[in-house]
Amino acid sequence: MPAPENRFKTAIHAGKPQIGLWLDMGEAITAEIAGTAGFDWLVIDGEHGPNDLRSIIDQLRALATSPAEPVVRVPVGESWMIKQLLDAGARTLLVPMVDSAEQASDLVSAMHYPPRGIRGMGAAVARASAFNTIADYADSASDGVCLLVQAETRAAINDLDNILAVEGVDGVFIGPADLAADMGYLGRIDEPEVQAVIEAAIVKIVAAGKAAGILTFNEAYNRRYLELGASFVAVGADVTEFANTLRALSARYKGGSAPQPSRSGY
């Protein structure tokens, strides 16, 4: 029996738009609720969310029967961390701050068993192989894993052609907030120069046959990115949706107006 199909990977390779949500509360119950909301993918955020390996596993369990595919964002692209998360049952990993093709190539290697990569054996005692009940797991694991790298600096944009040429990179995710900050526009993704770079990057990613992704809290931007061919677009986060809804509810009964949320995301 091979490893189960990664629906998210299949969809983005087919160019089918996937709408997602960020999970930053670090709670399994929140993930479980989000899994009923109709999103195609949900990011368990290990970079900015209050997560560790155990809380990530709890959220993976909570989403096990959900139609939404979990994507785990690692805090940093270290091979040992990637190995742990893959063994824990994560199949799609999002890696922040990938600035070069060399970094991307190293990440691809960390995702796969030898001879293709350097992933250490050990899934037989972990969730990934259903605790050794998926007999062909090691042989089929590569088919199910999906690597998304984040381009969120000028260095990454400058090396984007080479990053896109790395076999085994399934998609490139543009980090608009960090990119804007690196370009000198801290907290200002609305700047025309920033938007021009983002749009050009999406077009380039799609033209190279890779999946393009992004997160913003701005509906107009998100629809524009989908028009340009972005295939995995996150449109909100659990923390902000929860906070904004509560503030609006309170304001409706107590008078006044709720604080205006950021449109950019992160």
Swiss-Prot record:
Query: Which residues carry the site feature described as Transition state stabilizer?
Result: 73
Q: Give the required cofactors.
A: a divalent metal cation
Instruction: Give the record's GO CC terms.
Output: cytoplasm
Q: What is its EC number?
A: 4.1.2.-
Q: Where does a divalent metal cation bind?
A: 152, 178
Q: Where is the active site?
A: 48
Care to name a GO molecular-function term for this sequence? metal ion binding
Keywords in alphabetical order, please: Lyase, Metal-binding, Pyruvate
Q: What class of enzyme is it?
A: lyase
For this chain, the family text in UniProt reads:
Belongs to the HpcH/HpaI aldolase family.
Summarizing the function annotation, the protein's role is: Aldolase which can catalyze in vitro the aldolisation reaction between hydroxypyruvate (HPA) or pyruvate (PA) and D-glyceraldehyde (D-GA). The condensation of pyruvate and D-glyceraldehyde produces 2-dehydro-3-deoxy-L-galactonate as the major product and 2-dehydro-3-deoxy-D-gluconate. Has weak activity with hydroxypyruvate and D-glyceraldehyde.
Name of this protein: Hydroxypyruvate/pyruvate aldolase
